[in-house]
């Protein structure tokens, strides 16, 4: 259908006021007008900007300044075709769009995929077409074949990408590198290999059918036409479906099971991998015939995905098929405790596709795998000989068949005889072997790979310990575990480098047979495991909660199956099981009693040695860390808190007996000593905490912790076996509730102790520092609290010296005013810093006088502090960052690149923030625009805050600016730090305590004493006044002046305004004026006479000079009153020779020029909002001189149009230093921008000076 034949719905564009930019098709304008749209000639009045060229300056100006929607003409055409107004954000012509300048040709994709890709590309600024011609910049093709592909491949101007490129670019909101998405990166396998694995994967596919339905919602319409999820494609790399196309599926991050990826995959464009063949995806390592080997070898998306999988992306429980994970957990229940306890990204079993991708392993890798599997093989043999349970032969046979089936599914290419499950640590070694050494050099994950290599060495040591503890006789298991607990400090020292609190692999493998027996025998173990999981969640990190959901679900399913099997047992079998359980308990009790006596004697000797070593190490720590006492206390508390968490875990999983308590005490004490030695030598950078005198010694906290531990042990009533080998009897529901209640009480006591300790210490955590308040009033003092100081003399006893300010003050009269105010309120000012000085007024900490003042314990403050105490009428310690000298030299500008704005602060707080920004060198704007770099918020709300979030402007608290003033220049680079995003602070302008040095506060810790003689000298003159009756001096007041009684004709009635006089004088002049029949002008525009003593650049003078007929002296009114009629003005014209010489003008000549022709007649002014004087003042001055003010910023094109066309009025731009960012476009186009003096001096001299006041 032709565009001119389309009928525009009535009132479709009724609310649209459009401003066309550039040359538009007349048909577009006709459509808009047919829909009742209105065309405006000025963009500030428009609601929509219609432009084809996104680089036009008017487009950026409309978007940045006026925040107007800018759309292409196609928005109008397509809206008319669709019969409804389409959203504007899909038709932006600006170059900031993701696919701006992209013309893509789609080939070899299905109609549904083509529609999706077409919509995404065009919505984000690109164009799509089906024909491949010279206009095309990109060819989107899923596989490297076809005529279009061959044509584009021969021409380097056309970039060839897969559909992944579109989806990933939209997802990450930036155009991705096309080289990573070339279809030739796909490598095909031979047909024979596909046939070999077809049968195995069909079997696995049938078992994973339920998982396909479960996860199919995560696949996108582009990536899955048949509904199969991406992660299932990876778990079965070869599919036997005959309806698949023969392209290859590239690796991408869409299979990443991390929460960020899952959230991204749930968007309306979740697809990240195009629908292509299910051929196995491998790393490209130099395919034959590759014309671009450098690109493919080092930039392959497969490397990126494999890297993510290695770094914990896909090696998780969630990617395992549910039935496989269920049976694996049934067979190896001992791994449950490890999975619940350890928050490690490398959990679960690796996906089967990884084994399909593994190249032949190196000899070193095979040696590591064999070494890690050897002790596990011993465990399996031990498990076969262990009397697990008396099950029926059919059940045992079925269980063995399930084990073999799982082993074949999970390990199709790497099977080991007599191994039913893989060791959890061994599983982590396979993905790491897939990275090529050359690729490691080009990957940012080299550090991660080095971390895996370090784990190899650590695991070899762990396996050596494991071989020592694994014995073929079950009755010696308990003794071996107790010996291992004695060796635990060395093992914990190794595990501390891994930063985990997990059990050793030797403990897990040694406990597997007994734990499996326990799970097969106990009907109530499901409740107990749930209870233990809930208790562990309180002490472990919250991240474990994300993984425990699926783990608990699979575990419950396995336990239910076990219970169903237990129901089929005969009563004789159940009775036999109970008898075996009782016998095991009796044997363990005897062994515990015999070992207890031996360990008691050993413990006494070890305790004495530990105390001796602790004292020595404590003394050594104090000597080594003498310069950092606060850091050692922070580190001590961190160790103690870690020990409390370890005690909680051990109390949940070990027996309550005296033996375990002694071993735990011994183990923790030795671990604490080793950690102290390590951390004393490697003390991290900590912010020193003040108030260190309130720190509790570490030994005292250790005693409190031990006492609490002794109190906790009797409360735990749950029978447990030592070292995790538990043969628990079933607990009644009431006993379990009581047990849970007791544990909660103990944990509550632990939390209270930790909270008390955290309140006493002051660590450099972001939110704690942000909420810390300035030094408390009881610590810092002004005057002696016991002496009452009169409010009028609140500076009594203060002797000031002034530094920095005299050099920076051009007006010496201001400094004299300061001295007069100090003396008026009882203080004195010395010319130089002397011994009797008590205060130093200075701006910066970088001066010799400041250093001397600190050395002599003087109170160093700024003039802003003096202003604050003048308002309070009391000498108080400095309480805001503005009251302390800045940490950089005077005139230093660390924030010179920042343009700040403020929201939520009012009155004095807002004024202080302006001053702080000025001291830091930042530009301040009362408004918020896209050019602002920082928004300082009091609370996260308001229109400015919402706009700042929309425009991605950092929002910080006032603490950010306080830290910069006090020397923490790292805040400039760490503007997104969490300490600066804590809002609603009690005193947001208070300084950070760690930045206010003790030297700066030492003088304020001693109150300033005033001698009684000085106080008596102040109070003596007051006593006579107290005896006399209180006689208040008469305060002159302005009387209500009656209106004029004498009436004159309107032409003869003068309308007068006064400027530069005292209010009482003005009152007398108004009386005389009313008697003579004159009137006081309401506004400057209505005045005929201006009465002034001298030329002053006040608002009244600068406005009246353009409209008043006469500017006269007060003598004119006096003489008129004497003669009872208005005298001739020519004899009383104001003449100010000094001002006329200063500004190079003649007042009389200026008045004549203004009467003949107003200075700004026929001229438009745009004044930026941050101008000084205020915008309202400037508006009044300009309008009195005949000019007009533009409320919206004109575009560059509009200014040039008015400049070139003489018939149009001239547009003059007035701005200030803080608003120059709004004029960047004008500077780029060589348009002059002037400061306020162009207007102020111009109206005074009645001359236009285009050269003297423009910004360069």
UniProtKB/Swiss-Prot annotation:
It is found in: Nucleus. Residues 8-93, 94-183, 794-883, 890-978, 1053-1134, 1155-1196 form the BRCT domain. Keywords: DNA damage, DNA repair, Nucleus, Repeat, Transcription, Transcription regulation. Involved in DNA damage response. Promotes ubiquitination of PCNA following UV irradiation and may regulate recruitment of polymerase eta and rad51 to chromatin after DNA damage. May function as transcriptional cofactor in TGF beta signaling. Accentuates smad2-dependent transcription. Residues 188-205 have a biased composition (Acidic residues). Signal peptide: none annotated. Its main location: nucleus. It comes from Xenopus laevis (African clawed frog). Residues 184-295, 366-387, 701-782, 1025-1049 are annotated as: Disordered. Interacts with smad2 via its last three BRCT domain-containing regions in an activin signal-dependent manner. Residues 231-249 have a biased composition (Basic and acidic residues). Pfam families: BRCT, BRCT_2, PTCB-BRCT, RTT107_BRCT_5. Residues 701-773 have a biased composition (Low complexity). GO terms for cellular component: nucleus. It comes from the Eukaryota. A motif (Nuclear localization signal) lies at residues 857-874. GO terms for biological process: DNA repair; positive regulation of transcription initiation by RNA polymerase II. This is PAX-interacting protein 1.
């Amino acid at each position: 259908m032709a565009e001119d034949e389309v009928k525009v719905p009535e009132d479709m564009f009724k609310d649209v006021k459009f401003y066309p930019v550039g040359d538009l098709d007349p048909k577009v304008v006709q459509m808009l007008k047919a829909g009742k749209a209105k065309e405006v000639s000025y963009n500030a009045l428009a609601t929509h900007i219609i432009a084809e060229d996104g680089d036009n300056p008017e487009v950026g100006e409309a978007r940045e300044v006026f925040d107007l929607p800018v759309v292409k003409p196609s928005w109008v055409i397509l809206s008319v075709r669709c019969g409804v107004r389409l959203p504007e954000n899909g038709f932006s012509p600006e170059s900031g769009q993701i696919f701006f300048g992209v013309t893509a040709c789609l080939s070899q994709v299905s109609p549904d995929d083509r529609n999706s890709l077409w919509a995404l590309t065009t919505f984000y600024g690109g164009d799509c077409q089906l024909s491949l011609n010279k206009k095309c910049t990109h060819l989107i093709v899923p596989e490297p074949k076809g005529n279009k592909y061959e044509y584009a491949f021969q021409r380097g101007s056309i970039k060839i990408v897969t559909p992944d490129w579109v989806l990933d670019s939209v997802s990450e909101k930036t155009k991705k590198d096309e080289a990573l998405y070339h279809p030739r990166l796909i490598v095909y396998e031979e047909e024979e290999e596909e046939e070999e694995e077809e049968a195995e994967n069909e079997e696995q596919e049938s078992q994973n059918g339920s998982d396909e339905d479960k996860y199919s919602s995560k696949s996108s319409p582009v990536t899955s036409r048949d509904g199969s999820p991406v992660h299932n494609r990876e778990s079965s790399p070869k599919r036997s479906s005959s309806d698949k196309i023969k392209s290859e599926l590239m690796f991408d991050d869409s299979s990443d099971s991390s929460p960020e990826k899952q959230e991204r995959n749930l968007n309306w464009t979740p697809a990240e991998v195009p629908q292509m063949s299910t051929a196995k995806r491998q790393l490209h390592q130099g395919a034959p015939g590759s014309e671009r080997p450098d690109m493919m070898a080092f930039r392959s998306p497969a490397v990126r995905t494999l890297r993510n999988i290695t770094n914990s992306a896909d090696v998780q429980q969630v990617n395992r098929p549910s039935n496989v994970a269920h049976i694996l957990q049934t067979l190896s229940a001992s791994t449950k405790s490890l999975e619940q306890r350890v928050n490690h990204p490398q959990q679960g079993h690796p996906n089967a596709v990884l084994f399909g991708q593994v190249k032949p392993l190196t000899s070193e890798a095979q040696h590591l795998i064999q070494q890690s599997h050897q002790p596990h093989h011993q465990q399996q043999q031990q498990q076969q000989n262990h009397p697990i349970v008396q099950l029926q032969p059919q059940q045992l046979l079925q269980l063995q068949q399930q084990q073999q089936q799982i082993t074949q599914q999970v390990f199709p290419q790497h099977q080991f005889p007599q191994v039913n499950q893989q060791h959890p640590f061994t599983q982590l070694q396979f993905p790491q072997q897939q990275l090529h050494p050359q690729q490691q050099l080009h990957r940012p994950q080299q550090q991660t790979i080095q971390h895996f290599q370090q784990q190899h060495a650590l695991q070899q040591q762990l396996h050596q310990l494991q071989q020592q503890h694994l014995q073929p006789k079950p009755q010696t298991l308990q003794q071996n575990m107790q010996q291992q607990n004695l060796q635990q400090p060395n093992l914990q020292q190794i595990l501390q480098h891994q930063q985990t609190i997990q059990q050793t692999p030797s403990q897990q493998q040694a406990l597997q047979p007994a734990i499996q027996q326990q799970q097969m025998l106990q009907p109530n173990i499901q409740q107990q495991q749930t209870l233990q999981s809930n208790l562990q969640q309180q002490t472990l990190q919250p991240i474990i909660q994300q993984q425990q959901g699926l783990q608990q679900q699979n575990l419950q399913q396995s336990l239910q199956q076990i219970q169903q099997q237990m129901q089929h047992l005969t009563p004789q079998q159940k009775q036999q099981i109970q008898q075996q359980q009782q016998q095991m308990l009796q044997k363990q009790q005897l062994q515990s009693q015999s070992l207890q006596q031996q360990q008691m004697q050993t413990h006494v000797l070890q305790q004495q040695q530990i105390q001796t070593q602790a004292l020595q190490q404590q003394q050594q720590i104090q000597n080594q860390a003498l310069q950092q006492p606060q850091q050692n206390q922070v580190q001590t508390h961190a160790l103690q808190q870690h020990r409390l968490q370890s005690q909680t875990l051990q109390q949940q999983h070990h027996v309550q007996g005296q033996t375990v308590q002694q071993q735990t005490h011994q183990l923790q004490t030795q671990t604490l000593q080793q950690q102290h030695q390590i951390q004393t030598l490697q003390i991290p950078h900590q912010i020193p905490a003040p108030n260190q005198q309130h720190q509790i010694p570490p030994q005292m906290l250790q005693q409190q912790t031990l006492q609490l531990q002794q109190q906790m042990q009797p409360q735990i009533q749950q029978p447990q076996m030592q070292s995790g080998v538990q043969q628990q009897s079933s607990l009644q529901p009431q006993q379990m509730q009581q047990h849970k209640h007791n544990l909660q009480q103990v944990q509550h006591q632990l939390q209270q102790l930790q909270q008390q300790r955290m309140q006493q210490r002051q660590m450099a955590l972001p939110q704690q520092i942000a909420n810390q308040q300035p030094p408390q009033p009881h610590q810092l003092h002004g005057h002696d609290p016991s002496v009452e100081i009169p409010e009028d003399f609140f500076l009594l006893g203060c002797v000031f010296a002034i530094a920095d300010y005299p050099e920076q003050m051009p007006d010496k009269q201001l400094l004299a005013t300061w001295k007069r105010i100090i003396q008026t309120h009882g203080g004195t000012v010395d010319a130089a810093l002397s011994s009797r000085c008590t205060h130093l007024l200075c701006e910066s900490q970088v001066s010799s006088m400041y250093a001397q003042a600190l050395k002599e314990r003087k109170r160093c403050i700024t003039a802003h502090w003096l202003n604050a105490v003048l308002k309070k009428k009391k000498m108080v310690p400095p309480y805001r960052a503005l009251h302390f000298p800045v940490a950089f030299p005077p005139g230093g500008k660390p924030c010179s690149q920042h343009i700040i704005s403020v929201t939520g602060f009012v009155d004095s707080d807002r004024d202080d923030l302006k001053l702080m920004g000025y001291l830091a060198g930042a530009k301040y704007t009362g408004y918020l625009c896209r050019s602002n770099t920082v928004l300082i918020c009091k609370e996260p709300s308001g229109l400015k805050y919402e706009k700042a979030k929309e425009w991605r402007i950092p929002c910080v608290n006032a603490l950010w600016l306080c830290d910069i003033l006090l020397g923490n220049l790292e805040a400039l680079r760490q503007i997104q730090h969490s300490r600066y995003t804590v809002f609603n602070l009690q005193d947001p302008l208070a300084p950070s305590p760690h930045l206010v040095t003790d030297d700066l506060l030492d003088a304020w810790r001693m109150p300033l004493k005033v001698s009684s003689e000085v106080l008596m000298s102040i109070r003596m003159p007051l006593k006579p006044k107290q005896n006399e009756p209180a006689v208040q001096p008469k305060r002159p007041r302005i009387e209500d002046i009656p209106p004029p009684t004498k009436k004159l004709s309107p032409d003869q009635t003068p309308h007068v305004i006064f400027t530069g006089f005292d209010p009482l004088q003005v009152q007398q002049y108004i009386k005389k004026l009313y008697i003579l029949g004159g009137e006081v002008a309401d506004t400057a525009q209505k005045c005929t006479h201006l009465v002034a003593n001298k030329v002053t650049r006040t608002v009244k003078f600068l406005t009246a000079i353009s409209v008043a007929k006469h500017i006269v002296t007060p003598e004119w009114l006096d003489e008129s009153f004497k003669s009872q009629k208005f005298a001739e003005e020519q004899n009383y014209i104001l003449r100010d020779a000094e001002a006329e010489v200063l500004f190079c003008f003649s007042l009389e000549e200026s008045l004549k020029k203004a009467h003949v022709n107003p200075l700004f007649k026929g001229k438009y002014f745009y004044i930026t909002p941050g101008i000084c004087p205020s915008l309202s003042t400037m508006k009044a001055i300009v309008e009195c001189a005949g000019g007009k003010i533009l409320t919206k910023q004109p575009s560059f094109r509009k200014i040039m149009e008015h400049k070139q066309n003489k018939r149009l009025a001239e547009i003059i731009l007035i701005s200030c230093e803080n608003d120059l960012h709004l004029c960047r476009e004008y500077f780029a186009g060589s348009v002059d921008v002037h400061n306020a003096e162009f207007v102020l001096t111009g109206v005074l001299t009645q001359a236009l000076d285009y050269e003297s006041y423009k910004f360069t």
